[in-house]
Amino acid sequence: MSTQKQKLNKLAIFLIPIGIAVNVVGGQLAVLLKLPVFLDSIGTFVVGALCGWGPGLLVGLGCGLINAISLPTLLPYTVIGMLFGVLANLMAKKGMFSAVWKAPLNGIMIGIISTCIAVPITATLYGGFVGTGASVIVTTLMAAGWDVVPATFVSELTSELTDKIICLIIIFFVLKAMPARFVVKLPNGKYFIKED
């Protein structure tokens, strides 16, 4: 039993850098293209859902630290990525990745949670401007006479909802595409294997 548990831990540890790489590539692509979405949480959710909150949290932390190298303003948002790893674990245990129709609902829920955390960071530390594509929305709204907090809220909510709905649909299909013989070896694999 302990040998099997060590293998599970080794497999989960193996997936952490893969999750970080997926996040970093998605996040950097969104920043470079100035997209109004982030695309930097897919790896966190997949690893958190399959391997548990600890590996998911580490993926969120690693991604946040690496992304902050090229765009230091992203560092305070690392806490949100870490929270995603924990939430992915809870969502897996509650069967929230079991049907495609749940993905947009999950995206809305996660988008609202992340907006509530991101708005105070963005408005307080950066005056609404982080240097991502979402800053375009803030600029437009502030030019129209909006104050920084409501403009930041609308910008964050728009970006987060769009991003998280897209990401959670992708995550659903990634999880469904994984072979059962692989998934069953992971700590949360039992939540993704259907009994016949």
Give residue spans per PLM region.
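Hydrophobic transmembrane alpha-helices
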Residues: 1-50, 54-65, 85-93, 171, 175
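A generic short alpha-helical patch detector that favors 3-5-residue windows
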Residues: 13, 17, 79, 145-146
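Alpha-helical transmembrane segments of multipass membrane proteins
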Residues: 22-27, 59, 63, 67, ...
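Interfacial aromatic-anchored transmembrane helix boundaries in multi-pass membrane proteins
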Residues: 24-39, 61-102
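Short glycine/serine/threonine-biased micro-segments
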Residues: 25, 46, 50, 54, ...
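Membrane-embedded alpha-helical hairpins and interfacial helices in multi-pass inner-membrane proteins
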Residues: 32-34, 74-76, 97-196
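A short hydrophobic/aromatic micro-motif that marks alpha-helical segments and, especially, helix-coil
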Residues: 55, 66-69, 177-179
